[in-house]
């Protein structure tokens, strides 16, 4: 089961290239002798690649949410061209004032398009968007915006509903375990859609949730999975950024429907499907 993560990085980058290098006709009182120099400078700026920064909440592992975003970054370079954009990224940026510091440094380094890939970056990005109107900001899963800041997400809840249906048909214990990070809108949407899907095929289903309060914490994910298995869950899923739940399901002989990436590499027997952000 695959879903399309519409980062629109390539399109956004190209749009920004033209928007940010557009010439302003105001103040055209420069001396005629200086006009050739100004024209040359404008041409040079127009030919420079757009600098794009990506801020990641977790490391780029073999699988997971951050890995899928980085695949999108590399895809943008391939499709737009290295002569048009250059990218940089910072991993393991917490959803604290550190995010503002990292993004501000990216701006100081000349990045004109910033992708903030985690919900908790929202307020910091909105603040910086107001400070730097000539920089474009793309924020994942949030709801605040500015003239130069927009949001992006996918209709992942549709896939969650289908995954719930599959889990509801596969379980023998009628207990499904769900490892979740934070009770934010995106995560709650996923839990609700998954539960509705499961109950549509098996009204007796119980969906039990364990909160980790972390996007990336493999030991917590493992412990949470073990807790849910101990409570009778024979099918697991997760909204966190690790493969630990899939690994725990594999080790316990249970079933798993991973989120973000295909995790058959760590759960070849346990994985019955995967929601892949593609």
Where are these regions (language model features)?
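Bacterial N-terminal signal peptides that target proteins for export
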Residues: 1-10
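C-terminal motif of bacterial Sec signal peptides marking the signal peptidase cleavage site
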Residues: 18-22
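A residue-level marker of the well-folded mature domains of exported/periplasmic proteins
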Residues: 23-278
């Amino acid at each position: 089961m695959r879903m399309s993560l519409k980062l629109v990085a390539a399109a956004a980058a190209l749009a920004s290239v033209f928007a940010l290098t557009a010439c302003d006709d105001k103040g055209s009182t420069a001396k005629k002798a200086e006009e050739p120099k100004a024209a040359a400078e404008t041409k040079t700026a127009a030919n420079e690649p757009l600098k794009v920064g990506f801020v990641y909440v977790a490391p780029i592992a073999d699988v997971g949410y951050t890995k899928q975003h980085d695949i999108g970054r590399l895809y943008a370079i391939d499709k737009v061209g290295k002569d048009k954009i250059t990218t940089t990224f910072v991993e393991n940026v917490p959803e604290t004032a550190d995010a503002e510091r990292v993004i501000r440094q990216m701006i100081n380094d000349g990045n004109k398009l910033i992708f903030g890939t985690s919900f908790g970056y929202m307020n910091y990005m909105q603040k910086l968007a107001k400070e730097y109107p000539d920089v474009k900001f793309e924020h994942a899963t949030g709801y605040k915006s500015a003239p130069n800041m927009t949001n992006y997400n996918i209709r992942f809840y549709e896939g969650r509903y289908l995954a719930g249906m599959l889990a509801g048909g596969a379980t023998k214990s009628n207990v499904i375990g769900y490892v979740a990070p934070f009770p934010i809108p995106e995560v709650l949407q996923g839990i609700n859609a998954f539960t509705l899907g499961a109950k549509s095929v098996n009204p007796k289903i119980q969906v039990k949730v364990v909160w980790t309060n972390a996007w990336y914490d493999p030991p917590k994910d493992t412990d949470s999975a073990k807790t849910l298995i101990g409570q009778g869950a024979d099918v697991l899923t997760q909204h966190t950024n690790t493969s630990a739940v899939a690994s725990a399901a594999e080790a316990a002989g249970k079933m798993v429907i991973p989120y973000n990436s295909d995790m058959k590499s760590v759960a070849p027997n346990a994985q019955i499907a995967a929601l892949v952000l593609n």
